[in-house]
């Protein structure tokens, strides 16, 4: 793994234009990044989805054990494990089709569709988390997976598109500051929802 990780660092060279680009001050770069309206809108959407997901997800195990499984910890854990397994399998299977749909229908449209699908999965959990039919509680997680996959997969691609638009407008290639702000927002959202 170390060798394959080092090969791109050794063999791939940057373009010469990046060396001649004048340095931009950090505060000025942050201000211009935050003033980019498409980036702010995309980031706010990302924040809302992240905080919503990370606040609700830890409660799912407790709901499955104490409501759906009526206190049976092993059965509740089994339901949670099967749901998590389905979530992971669906993400692996649907990664390529989601990327293809993003290219065909437009990333924004697929992202909006994914958010709607994820919200419908959360709404379905209100009706499918029932002690009468406990196996139905597995259904919402793969549905939520589709929306989650759209958010995580297309968000990065959309930030790259915003970097390209910003370069056309400003003349500077500033994907580093966009990536830094995105990761700061991501980690802050997780910390805020913990």
Task: Please report, for each region that a protein language model flagged, where it lies by residue.
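Membrane-embedded alpha-helical bundles of multi-pass transporters/translocases
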Residues: 1-194
């Amino acid at each position: 793994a170390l060798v394959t990780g080092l090969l791109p660092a050794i063999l791939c060279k940057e373009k010469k234009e990046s060396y001649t680009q004048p340095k931009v001050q950090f505060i000025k770069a942050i201000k211009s990044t935050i003033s980019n309206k498409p980036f702010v809108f995309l980031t706010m959407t990302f924040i809302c989805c992240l905080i919503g997901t990370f606040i609700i997800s830890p409660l799912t195990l407790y709901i499955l054990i104490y409501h759906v499984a009526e206190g049976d910890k092993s059965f509740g854990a089994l339901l949670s494990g099967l749901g998590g397994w389905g979530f992971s399998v669906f993400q692996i299977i649907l990664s390529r089709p989601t990327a293809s749909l993003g290219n065909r229908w437009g990333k924004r449209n697929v992202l909006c569709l994914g958010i709607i699908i994820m919200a419908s999965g959360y709404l379905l959990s209100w009706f499918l988390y029932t002690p009468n039919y406990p196996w139905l509680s597995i259904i919402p997680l793969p549905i939520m997976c589709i929306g989650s996959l759209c958010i995580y997969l297309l968000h990065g691609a959309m930030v790259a598109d915003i970097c390209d638009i910003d370069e056309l407008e400003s003349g500077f290639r500033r994907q580093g500051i966009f990536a830094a702000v995105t990761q700061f927002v991501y980690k802050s959202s997780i910390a805020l929802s913990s």
